[in-house]
Amino acid sequence: PPSWGIRIRSVLFFVIYNAVGIVHGLNCLLIGWFLPRDQRYRFVNIWTRFAMWLLGRLNGVRIRVEGREHLQDGPMVIIANHQSSWETFYLQLLISPQATVLKRELLWLPFFGWGLALLNPIRIDRGKGRAALKAVLEQGAERLKDGIPVVIYPEGSRQKPGTLGHFNHGGSLLACRNKVPVV
């Protein structure tokens, strides 16, 4: 079991992270809609940067990125494993702006969903397979034409660390149809 120090730091992170998230979510609701796209991404990601900083300071999380040279400016499809909330946050900082394919229910979450909606994600109803694929292909093509990278978690939901789920083909199909690289 985790030590008491780890437990206390984890609870402290959770409390601070959520308190700042509520305040920032309200600010996003009041200010974010009026900002141009690039400023909106930077504004929303203030909370993300804070969360990554807090993880490092409070919980000792260190980040090392290998292969950053493979990331380019402009349109591409990023296919990523989904093991926790962490990678969704960090990818927002690593590649911004971006359009993330996500389940629409995330946008219904108070505060968090309000900020997320400002990033113009590709919303899908995971219960409707064909309609979800159509949304990814159509909305993804629009974002790519605008020069915005698209992030897809092809397993559809979180997987246990070290395991791989079934990869849906929407990301590769989107990249092939739009002749953009896959990272």
Task: Report each predicted region and the residues it spans.
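A transmembrane-helix-recognition feature enriched in membrane-embedded lipid enzymes
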Residues: 3-64, 114-118
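Soluble catalytic domains of membrane acyltransferases
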Residues: 57-183
